[in-house]
Amino acid sequence: MKDPRDVLKRPVITERSADLMTEKKYTFEVDVRANKTEVKDAVESIFGVKVDKVNIMNYKGKSKRVGRYTGMTSRRRKAIVKLTADSKEIEIFEA
């Protein structure tokens, strides 16, 4: 987990995450093996901002069925990153 681009997979754009952006909180889907320190370092190095706090949520895979075949969807890990008050905003979310 050395490369920051391996830690952050993609931003999560939902109505709830858009509301959190006003509080300088940004949501990313991250690698399932990444910890809070790796997420913080990745966001700081990629976007050039200062991170105050990182919250992480784990989602287990769901059981899905197609005909008589059953399978599982992939598990996911989501991180909500709060920036410091004096930090600049992340431009990727501005559209």
Curated annotation (Swiss-Prot):
The keyword Ribosomal protein applies. One of the early assembly proteins it binds 23S rRNA. One of the proteins that surrounds the polypeptide exit tunnel on the outside of the ribosome. Forms the main docking site for trigger factor binding to the ribosome. SUPFAM superfamilies: Ribosomal proteins S24e, L23 and L15e (SSF54189). One of its GO terms (molecular function) is rRNA binding. Part of the 50S ribosomal subunit. Contacts protein L29, and trigger factor when it is bound to the ribosome. GO terms for cellular component: cytosolic large ribosomal subunit. Gene3D superfamilies: 3.30.70.330. Belongs to the universal ribosomal protein uL23 family. It holds the Pfam family Ribosomal_L23. The gene is rplW. Keywords: Ribonucleoprotein, Ribosomal protein, RNA-binding, rRNA-binding. This is Large ribosomal subunit protein uL23. It comes from the Bacteria. GO terms for biological process: translation.
